[in-house]
């Protein structure tokens, strides 16, 4: 089995510039491939991954698109594979028609694949294609990395989501059942008489988020102070999301 492990990374200024350049290139290639496939779909012409990949190769030969040659080539190919997967899901009625990616989306990411051990953790750093060694806050050991998703969040933080193989630990099945009643005052009560309260730290974070959102609404539009406040709101929102997910994960694990 595979799982994703998320670590925060701390790229330097040069590495940040490269990450954002790769994000722009991946978005451009994805949108270019989508436009190509959309036109072919409307004209009854079958265009798949191989045709969009050939389009990328031709663009790299043109001086106008020289920036594509400097970006992570694996990440560019992966963006086209994501597009192809989107069309497969659409035709199998598992998803809606793929849409163009906007540069105004605050959350951006790209995926790169481990080839010939070009992605690995060495000490307090992770080696990434074209980026070199990037400082990482590693909270657990990992073995072979299959691929990595580099994320830039609305709060201005950078993360590396590592896809790794793992063997799940077998769990004993007691064979029992339990009833759960989700409430408002308490998070839930079960049929054994146990009650789990809503976490107070999450309530405090929610109140802080509301305060910061009110401050944001009072800032002048397009001002520097508004952008600073937007990042502050995004940071609090990210904290609330992480706290909620951590709480739910712990409760579900305890019940199982």
Where are these regions (language model features)?
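Nucleic-acid substrate recognition interfaces
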Residues: 1-256
């Amino acid at each position: 089995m595979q799982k994703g492990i998320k670590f925060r990374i701390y790229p330097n200024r040069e590495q940040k510039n490269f990450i954002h350049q790769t994000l722009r290139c991946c978005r451009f290639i994805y949108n270019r491939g989508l436009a190509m496939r959309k036109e072919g779909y409307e004209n009854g012409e079958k265009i798949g991954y191989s045709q969009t990949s050939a389009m990328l190769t031709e663009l790299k030969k043109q001086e106008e698109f020289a920036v594509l040659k400097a970006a992570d080539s694996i990440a560019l190919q992966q963006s086209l594979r994501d597009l192809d997967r989107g069309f497969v899901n659409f035709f199998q009625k598992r998803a809606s028609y793929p849409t163009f990616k906007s540069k105004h989306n605050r959350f951006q990411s790209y995926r790169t694949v481990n080839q010939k051990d070009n992605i690995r953790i060495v000490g307090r750093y992770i080696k990434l294609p074209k980026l070199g060694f990037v400082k990482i806050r590693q909270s657990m050991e990992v073995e072979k990395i299959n691929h990595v998703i580099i994320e830039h969040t609305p709060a201005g933080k950078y993360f590396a989501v590592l896809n790794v193989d793992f063997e799940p630990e077998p769990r004993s099945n007691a064979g029992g059942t339990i009833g759960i009643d989700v409430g408002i005052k308490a998070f839930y009560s079960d049929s054994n008489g146990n009650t789990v309260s809503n976490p107070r730290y999450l309530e405090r974070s929610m109140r802080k988020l509301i305060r910061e959102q009110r401050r944001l609404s009072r800032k002048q539009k397009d001002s520097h102070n508004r952008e600073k406040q937007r990042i502050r709101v995004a940071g609090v929102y990210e904290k609330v999301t992480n706290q909620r997910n951590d709480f739910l994960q712990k409760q579900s694990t305890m019940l199982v």
